[in-house]
């Protein structure tokens, strides 16, 4: 009986030791995970490197963009608006892709430079430049259709919707970091900037409406650089690209440009 009791006690002790070892291992694992998460957050909050910021931004953007896209695709819908999207924006993008491929063919295959200026297939015949400059000509992102077949233009169209929004967030965050804003505030401000209701609504209906959201922070940052006697190239290039991209939004950018320049001037000097 005594031997049996000792054997039972030994079994209980060994079992207890086993449970304690498992609990301690779980505790150590959780502690290390907490420590790792803390290290990641401290690294994200540090001001030394912004690589972690943009990695996290890209991941969060991908999740939110995927969720938005799923709401359409899951219901059998496309991101191309049935009114202005198909007859104007999508057709202009596909036409511009064919136009660019035709120009490249004449240059590299026929070894001559010919820029078609008139097309009888546009309405009753129209000037190509005056017809397309409002939609695609001048926008650097609309050069991408040259690499995409016409039957795949819809896929590129949907990609460009999110790409413009993504670049708008990059542009806004660069502006915030230039003004020494902390990463956490910049991160939240960037998400609010690119996923506001108007941004999503406008980007789905008229994709190039997102372009001024890319250019404006760079133009304003260029003004700050000039006031600080830094090189003016950012202001010059951002203003030039925004002017070539779309005259309709350029005059709006100019209004904010003058207001911001005056505000910063009296604030600095």
Over which residues does each language-model region extend?
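Hydrophobic alpha-helical signal peptides and transmembrane signal-/tail-anchor segments
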Residues: 1-4
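Start-transfer (signal-anchor) and selected internal transmembrane alpha helices
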Residues: 6-8, 12-72
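Short helical patches
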Residues: 20, 27, 40, 44, ...
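Alpha-helical transmembrane segments and their immediate interhelical/interface regions
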Residues: 49-54, 58, 77-80, 247-262
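Alpha-helical hydrophobic membrane-insertion segments
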Residues: 58-66, 159, 259-262, 266
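Membrane-interface coil-to-helix junctions
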Residues: 64-169, 191, 196-213
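Membrane-embedded helix bundles of polyisoprenyl
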Residues: 166-179, 183-267
């Amino acid at each position: 009986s005594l031997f049996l009791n000792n054997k039972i006690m030994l079994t209980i002790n060994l079992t207890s030791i086993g449970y304690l070892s498992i609990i301690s291992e779980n505790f150590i694992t959780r502690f290390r995970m907490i420590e790792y998460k803390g290290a990641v957050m401290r690294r994200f909050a540090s001001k030394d490197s912004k690589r972690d910021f943009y990695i996290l931004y890209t991941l969060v953007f991908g999740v939110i963009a995927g969720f938005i896209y799923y709401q359409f695709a899951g219901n059998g819908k496309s991101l191309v608006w049935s009114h202005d999207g198909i007859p104007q924006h999508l057709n202009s993008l596909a036409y511009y892709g064919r136009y660019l491929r035709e120009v490249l063919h004449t240059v590299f295959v026929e070894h001559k430079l010919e820029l078609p200026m008139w097309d009888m297939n546009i309405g009753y015949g129209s000037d190509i430049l005056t017809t397309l400059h409002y939609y695609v000509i001048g926008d650097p992102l609309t050069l991408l259709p040259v690499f995409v077949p016409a039957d795949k233009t819809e896929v590129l169209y949907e990609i460009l919707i999110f790409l413009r929004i993504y670049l708008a967030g990059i542009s806004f965050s660069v502006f915030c970091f230039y003004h020494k804003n902390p990463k956490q505030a910049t991160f939240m401000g960037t998400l609010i900037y690119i996923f506001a209701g108007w941004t999503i609504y406008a980007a789905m209906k008229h994709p190039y409406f997102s372009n001024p959201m890319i250019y404006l922070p760079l133009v304003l940052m260029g003004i700050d650089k000039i006031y600080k006697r830094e090189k003016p190239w950012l202001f010059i290039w951002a203003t030039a690209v925004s002017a070539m991209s779309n005259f309709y939004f350029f005059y709006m950018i100019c209004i904010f440009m003058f207001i911001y320049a005056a505000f910063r001037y009296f604030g600095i000097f």
